[in-house]
Amino acid sequence: DKLLLTLGSWPIVPNFEGIDLENILLCKNYDHAKIIDEKKGSAKNVIIIGAGYIGVELAEAFEVLNKKVTLIDAEDRIMSKYLDKEFSDIAEKEFTNRGIKLVLGEKVVRFEGNNGKVERVVTDKGEYDGDLVILCIGFRPNTKLIEGKLDTLKNGAIIIDDYMRTSKEDVFAAGDCCMVRYNPA
């Protein structure tokens, strides 16, 4: 018998003060997308936290809907893990020309709100008003099930070889729960 593990991943949700305020959302799956779709109509100031692929796509989508968009990232440029500076500079210029506010090199410290709803994101360098906040700051492998049973990286990703074999014979793993075998970024 063989076992193939496809445990997936889940968005990273830091334990920031105010994280439980209404209208702070995740973006990973269909259910998250439905909630974002429901909330987009009433939102005026949208803050996207995380300027990777998902965050950048969301910023563009909300700009097309004529929302005031702020894109916050701790890195000093958007898509820093995927594009070199020459290309990210072009994308950043296009974003700012379209009215998207880029807040780069700042780390989120907390969320503030009123009547249980988010109103503001506070970073280590500033404060930004927003009535809808979407967290796009990365994912963690869903590997609690195999903790202590298979070899993993520090982040919990299952270590695999070129044939998706794990540290246990006849146990294979694929997808977001595994380490990345090739990542030029």
State where each predicted segment sits.
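Rossmann-like dinucleotide-binding cores of NAD(P)H-dependent redox enzymes
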Residues: 34, 45, 53-110
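FAD-site-proximal beta/loop scaffold in flavoenzymes
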Residues: 20-41, 115-120, 127-185
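Feature captures the FAD/FMN-dependent oxidoreductase FAD-binding
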Residues: 1-7, 110-117
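Nucleotide donor/acceptor-binding cores
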Residues: 2, 22, 43-45, 67
